[in-house]
Amino acid sequence: MHTAYIPVPTPVRPPSAERWPLAAVAELFELPFLDLLHRAQQVHRQHFDANTVQLSSLLSIKTGGCPEDCAYCPQSAHYDTGVDADKLMPLDEVVRAARAAQANGAQRFCMGAAWRSPKPHHLEAVAEMIGAVKALGMETCVTLGMLRDGQAEQLKAAGLDYYNHNLDTAPEFYGKIISTRTYQDRLDTLQQVREAGINVCCGGIVGMGESRRDRAGLVAQLANMEPYPESVPINNLVQVEGTPLAGAETLDPFEFIRTIAVARITMPLAKVRLSAGRETMSDSEQALCFMAGANSIFYGDVLLTTGNPQVEADRRLLQRLGMRAEGLPCAAGQA
């Protein structure tokens, strides 16, 4: 005789920093895989249409030459990765790329620049880009590095919807990945963004040699923000020759999916986004990520300087899964 399963209601937002202590997040990671996915899917369905994903597109508007020494990044000037330093992309090229992304179904257009911190004249140019993309009817997001006083307010005035600034990893592992920017620097920029009234896009990277507890530490940091980020990109390390992390041990795909599930459980209202590293995932792995609560993907041919599944492949996958892109009337690629 089967006993009916009655789900336990999950709070919408953690009421305080004590809601998700590290030990509690670590316990989620230790759950049997199927139990974890079941719980994450329940939480997901309480707040979202489980068969809908948001499509976002990411354009590098200024590539290479970054003075930071992030061990994973091919755009760092510290490493010889074959990525040349370019100047800021002209406005008309940005608008052309945004139109193409929109034509392919993207709702959010993200613009990334390889800077430690934007200079005033750079910010003025980016503000113009934000206005032009907003005029197309798309959500806007930028990632420009650390912000100085007043810069977040300038971006808000330009109409910016989201600012991306990742924590990358847990505080305990952070020093093994970067030395030119402190963890507190990142938190300070996020606080400026929040105080300016801009939505926060903040996540991290897994597969950099961190432990499962480090992954729990990253999620705990994100979940205990007040409030937690509206958008949480989870990146799977893309190993680039010439960076210190080239040749690192590849993360077990189930560990990546676990990270997605724990992010969904601890941040039930956030958009949990599959970001870098999707091109190495099988369709089955991506489907499990959707089951675990991912509801946004970066969509298009290029994700900054690394590969990303092509548009048609993404459309076919969503169609095979019976899923649809947010804002579109049917499964992506269907008439």
Curated annotation (Swiss-Prot):
Q: Could you tell me what the cofactor note in this record states?
A: Binds 1 [4Fe-4S] cluster. The cluster is coordinated with 3 cysteines and an exchangeable S-adenosyl-L-methionine.
Cofactor(s) for this protein? [4Fe-4S] cluster; [2Fe-2S] cluster
For biological process, the GO terms are: biotin biosynthetic process
Coiled coil residues, start to end: none
Pathway of action: Cofactor biosynthesis; biotin biosynthesis; biotin from 7,8-diaminononanoate: step 2/2
Which superkingdom?
Bacteria
Q: Which reaction does it catalyse?
A: (4R,5S)-dethiobiotin + (sulfur carrier)-SH + 2 reduced [2Fe-2S]-[ferredoxin] + 2 S-adenosyl-L-methionine = (sulfur carrier)-H + biotin + 2 5'-deoxyadenosine + 2 L-methionine + 2 oxidized [2Fe-2S]-[ferredoxin]
- What does the record give as the function of this protein? Catalyzes the conversion of dethiobiotin (DTB) to biotin by the insertion of a sulfur atom into dethiobiotin via a radical-based mechanism.
**What family does the database annotate?**
Belongs to the radical SAM superfamily. Biotin synthase family.
How would you summarize the oligomeric state and partners of this protein?
Answer: Homodimer.
- PANTHER family in UniProt: BIOTIN SYNTHASE, BIOTIN SYNTHASE, MITOCHONDRIAL
> Can you say what this protein is called?
Biotin synthase
Species, as recorded: Bordetella parapertussis (strain 12822 / ATCC BAA-587 / NCTC 13253)
Gene that produces this protein? bioB
